[in-house]
Amino acid sequence: MRLTEEQEKIIRHTTGHARVSAVAGSGKTTAMIRRVSHLLQQGVAPDKILVLMFNRSAKVVFAERLHQSLQGTTLRPPAVRTFHSLGLRLVASFTNRQYLPRYRLVTEDFQLEKLAREAMKKYGAEANGDETWISKEGIEGFLLFISRVKSDIASPQEVFAACGFEEQHAYYIHAYKVFESLRHAARIRFYHDLIHEPVMAIQAQKDLADWVADHLDYILVDEYQDINEVQQQLLLYIAGQQAQVMVVGDVDQCIYEWRGAQPKYIVSRFARDFSQPTNYTLSYSFRYGHRLALAANHLISNNRLRDRKLCLAWSTNPDTRITCLPEGEVQPLINILQNWQEKRGLNQAAVLVRIYAQAVPVELALLEHNIPYRLVGSETVFSCSEIRALLGYLRLCQGSLKKTGQDVDHVNHVDHINHADMSTVLAMLTHPHLWLKRDVLQSLAQKILKKPGSAGSLIKKYADEAGSPYLTSRILDLAEIWRKIRRKSPKTRAFTVLNTLIEETDLYAHFLNIFRLLIALVLTKGNNSFFEARQND
């Protein structure tokens, strides 16, 4: 593969720190691999080089490509790690030296949410908190606050102020202290503790800082625009005074500010922490044509905190056409794909969405026109719990909530309950959420499937277990809604059933927070016919 002059300069960088600003598709991974190979060929020992990545998949791909590039030589590849795997090694070392307690690592997200909810309930009881503190939105906000604190080295109070949390959520600060107390009592650490704990330990113990520093001669960091404060501190500590640090990134792709990443790190902070770096640019993209590159330059120029690089399309890139189509009743994508199929296969076409919620109307349009597709990285529209819940309410109206048969009083075993039916009812019980424990919800779902006609009465019986007047009222209201939908004629239009559900619950706000396009989708005239067509599926 022929390298560009810009890539060659990076590969043969001589001394000191370096900052590489790379546009999308500019061959930065190739340049980094060749840079590592160049260092090894110059006689640098592999254990004196460290390559840091931000996620495991990127690390695996880089390590495989590096290994392939060294085949046929006697050169041994250096360590390629993620920041978290590096943190894990430090935690193990600090634990053995008794600088950190020996805790169990918990990686399941639901365990983190469970502890956060427990902490919020405990502090809420002490501080007379209201029901919003333990609502889905309240817990999500609290989890975000925990993540921001763990991505920084500042105090919870300082993080709260710096990140612009609303003053009405100041209770997050005190709930965080309860959360940490519960975590230590349970002797567990979560994924984000793998970096936060060793960095805070190094800050508190100078001998630890001396112990971790100056073991490396070269450190290469990929996707540097994603770095946060606690990771920056870790990089500083392991580099010490000896390592030459080269970072590669694109400030225009800094999209993880919600977890502590900020454009300032690659724009100015790197040069402050790692003095007098040599600046390089990878300005040519090999992914797309001139028109798209030009459009991207014009758009991103509105960002203020960035470098002044321009994205240029490589001269041999195929042309990229840009067409802007207004979104109306008919999904414009359908005509595009139908015309595409006349000359090419669908395996040569792809649809990109900014967030997966935006894929919902696209999926429905493709399904309605029998155009096959494959969704990568997320559940398909009829697999996600929000849509399963809506279809479940339609089936409740039809009297077909239990597909495998009618009400059966004598069924007493879980084995007789269809798994798909169980998933549907659980989705209905959590959209809107009854706020009952998971095992209680599963028990209730089983009872409903045994006797769907009595669903409203079965839900009502759990009102006493709600634990607060607000949740009791919520359960009673939902029980009545289930009864109301069940009493409707099986021939009732899908739009009418769903509209009843939306008008009499907070489902609109619920979905707006977690699935912003869903209600617009349900209430769009063009999609009502689709739901009605699917009602009998």
Q: Residue locations for each model-derived region?
A:
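Accessory N-terminal region flanking or inserted into the helicase ATPase core
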Residues: 1-22, 26, 30-31, 48-50, ...
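P-loop NTPase Walker
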Residues: 1-99, 210, 240, 294-297
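Short, polar/flexible loop-turn hinges at active-site or ligand-entry regions and domain interfaces
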Residues: 44-48, 69-78, 94-108, 120-134, ...
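Conserved RecA-like ASCE P-loop NTPase motor core of nucleic-acid helicases/translocases
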Residues: 45-58, 78, 222, 248, ...
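ATPase/helicase motor core of nucleic-acid motors
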Residues: 86, 272, 316-320, 343-491
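Conserved C-terminal motor-coupling region of P-loop helicases
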Residues: 208-209, 408-414, 456-457, 508-537
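Conserved RecA-like helicase ATPase core segment
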Residues: 229-326
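C-terminal extensions
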Residues: 465-523
